[in-house]
Amino acid sequence: ALPISYSLGGDLTFERYAFKAGWASAWKKIKIGAEARFRAEHEYRTTDPRPRNIVTDLTLLFGASAPLLASHELGLTGGLRFYKQTNNVAFLREAGVIPEYHMLGLGMDYKRFSGNNASAYYKATGCEVGIDLVPTGKSGLMFSTQYAYTPYHRILPNLNALPISVLGVQTLKGEVGWRQGQRDGWLLKAAVCHERRTGNEQIAGSSSSTE
């Protein structure tokens, strides 16, 4: 998500905790599985300006696979992503504060809410799907594609939880290759990744010729 920016810099300290767990089972020729990934991150600085960013990121994936013809196995996956981030900036020095800027990307900021709006939070619920085709024997064609979409909503809590922008991130990945042998074999593959970002800003409040 796009940050709150200011004119003074400095190093940041961060703590990150992550875990991943999975489960798999089989019923006749059908295989099923699930996976959970969680990340928590805390980023801060002890000198002015003092940002404090807290992130929680949870991804849940479910999948199933079954034989396709006699030489391959087809797998389908789907999942959800739950993202939340809080962002606060504090000033403790006697000299006062400096303006904060809510960035919109491409070097632009939201002038209507820049200045003393030093708090924001972001939330998103995304989804992803995937298809995999793998050979069941020692050799064969391999194919994989994944699509994910996550809209990040930026909200100002000090203005009655006013949503001011949405950042939509779409990701498309694909791989195709050939596997020859297993223990002493080789694998040749080509991969491509495409990401598209779209922004949507909300116009709120009364108009002003200076904004």
Where would I find each of the regions flagged by the language model?
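Outer-membrane beta-barrel proteins
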Residues: 10, 41-55, 118-122
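Residues that define the transmembrane beta-barrel architecture of outer-membrane proteins
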Residues: 13-19, 52-58, 123-129, 149, ...
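Residues on the lipid-exposed face of transmembrane beta-strands in outer-membrane beta-barrel proteins
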Residues: 19-25, 60-66, 80, 129-135, ...
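Transmembrane beta-strands of outer-membrane beta-barrel pores
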Residues: 27-29, 38-42, 80-84, 147-153, ...
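Outer-envelope beta-barrel architecture signal
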Residues: 28-34, 70-76, 127, 137-143, ...
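Flexible, surface-exposed loop regions and adjacent strand-edge segments
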Residues: 49-57, 91-100, 159-165, 204-210
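Long, charge-rich C-terminal accessory regions
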Residues: 155-159, 164-168, 174-211
